[in-house]
Amino acid sequence: MTPALLHLDLIDPLLPELIALQRRDRCLLPEALSELADRLHVPLNRVYSVASFYQAFRFTPCGKHQIKVCVGAACYVKGAEHVYEAFRKHLNIPEDGDTSPDGLFTVSKVACLGCCMLAVAVQIDKHIFGHVTPSTVGRVVRDFLLMVRDEEAVTQDSAQADAKEKQQPEIRICRCSSCRAAGSGRIFDAFEEERRAGKFDYKVKEVGCHGMSYRAPLVTVMLENAAYHYDNVQEYDVRGIVAQHFSTKELTWKSRAFLDAFYSRRPQGCMKLAEPPPELDKLRLVTKNSGMDDPESLDDYRAHGGFAAFDRALTMTPAQIVYELKRSKLRGRGGGGFPTGEKWRMALEAPGDRKVVICNADEGDPGAFMDRMLMESYPYRVLEGILIAARTVGASLAIIYIREEYSQAVSVLERVIAKLRESGIFGSLPPGFDLVLFRGAGAFVCGEETALLESIEGRRGIPRKRPPFPVNSGLRGLPTLMNNVETFACVPIILVDGGEVFNAVGTDESHGTKAFALAGKVRHGGLIEVPIGITIDEIVEQYGGGAEKNHTVKAVMIGGPSGGCIPRSHFDIRVDYQTLQKNGAMMGSGGLIVIDESDCMVDIALYFLRFLRSESCGKCVMCREGVPHLCTLVESLTRKGPKPPGLLDRIENLARMIQQGSLCALGRTAPNMVLSALHEFHGEFEAHLDNECPAGKCMELTDFRVTDDCIGCTKCIQACAAGAIECEPLDSARILSETCVRCGVCRSVCPEHAIVNPCRERPEQEVPFREEPHTAPVDGDVIVIDGTKHPFVSGKTMLDYAILPTLCYMECGGTGAHCMVCAVWDAVLGRFVPGCEQLLQRGHIYETSSDRVRAFRKEALSLMLVRHDFRCGSCAAKGKCRFFDYVREYGAHKTKNELTYPEPVETPHLVFDGGKCILCQRCVGVSGEKLAVHNRADRAVISPGPDAWESLDATTAEKVCSVCPTGALTFKHGDARP
């Protein structure tokens, strides 16, 4: 039996099959899903439920070509929303659709393409375009159509490898996704074409990315005794570079080169020779040998010490490998910073004959691209770390969970894994070992390790309760070691150089280097690797080159959506896990986005809230309903009109509730950026209370004006994609307020700075962070509940000790912790935990009925009321609605919303009133998969799937109605409600 067949029981085929269907049909067709359900022997409703969870899937046909506009953080601050609207306008897409009338293009937004330094990035099919603006969308479409035409006409030339390949001069070019977006693919092809035309004796070599994408396309000419670097190379430069360094006897080529030099604006002898980029002299560990090796060449990797660490690992005991990792003090690079050596020790000591290693490459942060570049440019280093992990813990299967959007990284890894398999290196690992790729389907929450496991097992990516942790009970209940891409890439370096060498870099508590995706309003964006402990100012100024021309840096956003913002005044702080956390941010996976004075902090906070609102798994009420409501409150700051008193306090209080009451890390960190911005830029938030946006970003609060300094140069008219400026030559311009989209492009191109935002500047004032202190656990085998000590008994929940209000909990089974009405305060964790599901922990101190607990329950009930239509007069549950009993008991109140409530659905056996459903999911638990949750976040609904509600027989109808705590489900043959 082949290794792949040995592991079929671990990886569910549902998600891979759905991805294959989407590729084939460009959408998920009903008949294809029905056939898939029959073939996999799973309920059709489960197929629809899973498919609706992941954003990569669509149920309506799309155009022949798909345009994906990146709206990640770096692209957003560069105007991605305006680029998206420009594509729609250029292609005449109707307001209620996303496909052009000719069916050629479908335009959509994507959370991140991982090309942040080339913002705004746009992907059309497999081609990526960088630095797209509203005024260039037409050219992008034309260029793409020309590429398609050329690809269809081109035939590949399979030249024989030269026996003297290693002695040949080399022209090295990176073709990673970012550099391709800058045109390196075309430059690569141009050098190949010149080589063939002139019969030159050089080799065009694809190499790993140098990380300096602002210099791309970067070309290095490697001769016997020298290296020459050319940056920002264009196609018309190629022949001159070749003529500069190589000679040929081909008279035709020489005459063409002579004519080029004679007529060209850039003659071959005058081309600027770039100095070796200073970034290459910086300390590099995981990006070592950048720009030198062919990423897919196993020989290149071995020539520079590749797999020496793996060979050494084969001579060491697992305990010795773990010891070396502990000595290095490597911490996980995925965000949490958990000690890697300790995690490997736990996996090694976990009982079980069968174990799994998973590389979490689901880089979902909008603004991060480190993992993509590492996988595309240093795939063998990442894989070597994974193989060492498998050897250490005794795993027979390794899985790389990677985003489907990273098409080039997927292709590179597929080819590299195949080469490793052919090399026989897997034979040194446990019997039957295999390494496989698993493609994710677009869900940020699947970056959370337990949600990722659910996805591999063919379910919706909803985080599991912890403990147990994956290292003890992970994939299919097996011990599972999970680290991210950069963490695995560090392992070979540690084993070769020794843990002490790695430990010597960094600070006393954080060691080694960290790769960052530097992007946004900075001169030199790209992948950088810096020693941990460097200051933010050093990163922005030395690596990033400072602010863009005529701008000043305002702040950096670090840690992705779950991180925070650090203002310019605090750029002297050091970048390490502890310092960032103390300043309201976090290391995260390594996204670092620079913003300048033209960016609005309220708008930035709102952007991240909108992202997280759509990415919530939808399980717990504080994340599912709390984040959208917080989003509504922050959005009201950007609207013109009177603001309710105490609005900023309400925003902060709700944000704290969400932090303390969400089940998983996504919800608990969702308000971080809002709280951080509110803390560091309080004056800017107060300006919005007065209907002013100092940055000029919020449309309703901004009205650009042209001053008398205008000289009538018309540059603003040429740059305005909305056509909102009128001007006669040499006369003052006039902005049409009703047409202006407040993108600010006119202001940035005006040479006289004559376009201004009349909002007055506000002095910034810091507001102290309000943090809940954590309480130390008590000694002994006890727990403390409401001040009284009780003996600690493993496996118990708070329901075993106290009477709590419950809505979603069922003694007969089913999933709980959706409503959080049963929440209790855990003083040791410093947050609320579900009393129905959370196992009590030794030494912890709990509150079940304090004022803070009652206030939290009131907030949870109020958020659930958002979905309620309040048509209670005719409700069958009137007078015996447990939900409204709690609403009255805790004094919950309905929050204003603009929801459109569905009309009740009536069948022969039941009535379903969606306007009263609170998504407790009790009905799902007893329906035998005839009901399921479809979609996610605040779009989640209970549905029978493609089958109508009429498909529920009387027995099932009675079951689901009997457990409904509201009037959402009513049995027509007598009320079975308890």
Label each PLM-derived region with a short phrase.
Residues 234, 269, 397-411, 415-417, ...:
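Terminal amphipathic helices with adjacent charged low-complexity linkers/tails
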Residues 20, 24-109, 166-214, 220, ...:
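Small-residue-enriched alpha-helical segments and adjacent helix-cap loops
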Residues 83-118, 124-170, 226-327, 461-476, ...:
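Fe-S ferredoxin-like electron-transfer domains
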Residues 311-351, 503-504, 509, 517, ...:
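Accessory "access/gating" subregions that flank catalytic or transport cores
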Residues 278, 282, 410-532:
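Hydrophobic alpha-helical positions that pack around
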Residues 178-180, 325-347, 442-454, 613-625, ...:
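Conserved phosphate/anionic-ligand binding catalytic regions in large, soluble enzymes, centered on
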Residues 41, 70-78, 110-119, 174-182, ...:
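Cysteine-centered iron-sulfur cluster-binding motifs in ferredoxin-type domains/subunits
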